[in-house]
Every structure is written in C-alpha cells, then in structure tokens.
Amino acid sequence: MVKNAVTCMVIALTALLCVSCSAGGDIRVVSIEQVSPGEANIVVRISNGDSADKTGYRVREGYIAFLHDDGTGIVGTAGAMEGASVLWSPRGVTYGTETYEYLTTDEGTTRFTRETSKPYELQRYEFPNEDVGALFVLQGQQTVDVLGTGGTLTSLANAGIFQNNGQCGSRIVSITDTKLAPPVAPAAFEAYSAQSDDGEVPENMAVVVQLTDHDGDVPPVLAVAPMIDGLTSGQNMFSCEADVVTMPSFQATYPNASRDNGLDANVGTMVLQRWDLSTGQRTIIPVVDAEGGAIELNEERTIHLYEGIQVGDEYRFISANGDAFAVDVTSGQGRYLFSIPSRSRDHSTVFQVTETGVYALEDRGDDRVVTLFYRPWDGEEQRELFTTSDLGRYLKGKALTGQLDIQSFALRPGWDGGAQ
C-alpha cells in the first residue's frame, strides 16, 4: 500500500547546524525536522527497549545522532524502536520507529507512515535498485517494510519465525526449519520428496525461504534439507554470491545437552552452511585452521549475531560478543582473529565492519561515556578514534523513560577513517 510522505525541509537551518557541528561544543538535541548529516561520518541510533515495556508505565524514547570524526555533532528526537537499526546508503540514512519510517538526506528528513505498528526491528538491507528493506518480528511472523525510491512504503508479512536472515541480491531470504515455521512445512516436505530418492522423509526439515516479492503470507521455499540436531547460527546477514548462500554456523558437540545430563550445550565447532538456491541443495563444510584442527566455539567465544563482510573468497565477521573470525567460503579454511570484549555488563558494545577492519562503539556504562575504536583485521592493536561524554545525557534517560542504549550505528558510505 502506498503511503503519503511528509517532507520536512531544513534549508534555513542547514548552515546553523553545520556551524554547531564543527564548533567542537556539546552535542545538542533538535527535532527530527531539523536533522541532516552535514559533514558527519557516523550515525548512531539510541532507544530504550524491553526494559521500558516491563513496567508498563515507562515512556518510549529514542534519538538519532550524527557525529563527526571528533565525536561532536547533533542529536535528533527520533522516537523509540527496540532493536533499532540504521542504514547509511548513497540514497541517505534510513531508520524507523514503531509507527514511522524516516529517510534523512542533506535536503532534510522525509517521514513515511507504516501500515501497522512494528515494535521490534531485526535488520536493514539496501537492494541493488536503492530500495531499502527493514525486517521486523511480531507475534509469530516477520514483516518486511520496503521503502521504494519512488517515495512508497509497502509491507509484506511472512507467517513463521525465521532465525537466520540475510540479503541475496534483490531478495531477503531466511534459513529456518519446519518446527519454527509450520506454515512452510507442506511446501518444504513436497520439495524434499521431489529431490530425494531414498523414500524416507525426515521428521523436521531445514528450509530456505524468500521473504520478499511473493503473494500471500506464506513465503516460497527455495531450498530444503533434513534438519541437523545441534546446528544453529542466529544471524541477520550472510555471504551470498550468485545463488549460493554461505553462513558460518555452530555445530553443538552435545546436541542432547540438558540440565539433567550435565552436558554443555555451548560447546561445539564452527561449520559453514552452503545453500545453492539454484539446485535447492545444502552442503555442510567443517571450518578448520591452518593445521587442520576444528575452530572451537563455546560460551566465551561465539559467532551469534555477527557483523560480516566478504573480502575476496574470505568472509570476515565479528560476533555480538566481540569475537572476530575469517573463513574462506569455498574451502572452509578459517582463523580466529581477535576479541573485543565489552567493558560494561549492562550495555553492549556494537560493531560495524569494512574491508579493512572493525569499528566498535562502546558505551562504558557507569558514566555513559562513549568511545569509537577501530581495529584492523590483520591483528594490529585497536586504536581510539574519539571519546565523548556528550551522549550521556540522552543515554541516561529520564525518570519516565529509564536508561536508553545504543542500538546500532552506521558509517557514511566510503568513509573508513580508522584505516587512515
């Protein structure tokens, strides 16, 4: 459904905002109508999350901050979104709240109204035609809102839960199973029967489905394979070349681990799931180091919810826990690179990656001082790019909002200041 866009121009204020940004003073807050990137290179999304919902009385609140290389900048009142992501593409900066989708450029901010409220965001994707897809989860379904280049906002619901999501060209695809997504089970079992010769049908199937460009609320099945006990991942991105999806995954050593038997469910090894969408087939490739040994994973070293990028044949990524790896997507040759641990138990460090290295935005927690670090993939020591206490007043929140958190951040396209 096409939605009317309300364009908020900021021509009269642009010069004033740029002076404020370059003066090196405190970060100041303005309305969303007054926000534009200016000369900033980092954009930060701040919001309160589920802690604001548990009491039922707290006010939802959120901000969008545009920061310069020295940590100065401007903050706009952008509203709340749990799991809020932000995407900076050549088209501009896109982000959202439960009710609205925003596009901020140097010309101003445009607001689009959602068809239905979206309380929890998973990820944003830029398509080859510069459309932007935002993925949400709510009550047993995942919805994609697509912001078209023609000024439209359309929504497509997908029945089921899809625990691994990513982009493959102009499509958003997900790797799930028939237990979590029962609506796709009939098509999944039919597809498996058509490609299998043994006549045996597994109880549960692993399935790749397409969440965009389809009719109805049941996503079409692209590939199927028997579900493997203890094989998990939990990602919102993966490698995709042509029609081949490759996703680093965790294979549990003890798939039957439980409190009763005392086995550790967090102990396992890294493998690659490779799904060829042109044939509908899956291949599992063990990830090994230079000596042929398995890349071991555990509670302290994880791959869950990584930020990744492909450089040549190598997929480089850092998990939400701060553990960095590099894996050849064809051979499975892998290496552990380094870890960037968070110094706060209550506030996570968030990451972005480029071909050269990792950017880590750390909220220190106790005083809400924020630091941007950069560390190259090649193992050099990380270095500090800036530290600012000016975001603290927004992160600390108010009595009716509780504390807020940095949900995500993004870099201006082409900017790689940490590598300079």
Regions found by a protein language model. Give the residues of each.
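N-terminal "mature head" segments of proteins
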Residues: V2-V146, P413-Q420
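Repeated scaffold domains used in trafficking and secretory/extracellular systems
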Residues: D26-Q34, T77-G92, S117-V132, L156-D177, ...
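Hydrophilic extracytoplasmic domains
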Residues: S36-I42, G49-L67, R91-G92, L103-D106, ...
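Residue position within the beta-strands of beta-propeller blades
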Residues: V44, Y95-G96, L135-V137, V173-I175, ...
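Short loop/turn segments that connect beta-strands within the blades of beta-propeller domains
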Residues: R60, S89, G96-T99, T105-G108, ...
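Short coil/turn linkers that define WD40 beta-propeller blade boundaries
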Residues: T72, G108-T110, G150-T152, H214-D217, ...
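Fungal eukaryote-biased detector of long internal structured cores
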Residues: Q141-L147, L156, L180-P182, D217
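Acidic, serine/threonine- and glycine-rich low-complexity intrinsically disordered segments
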Residues: N164-D346
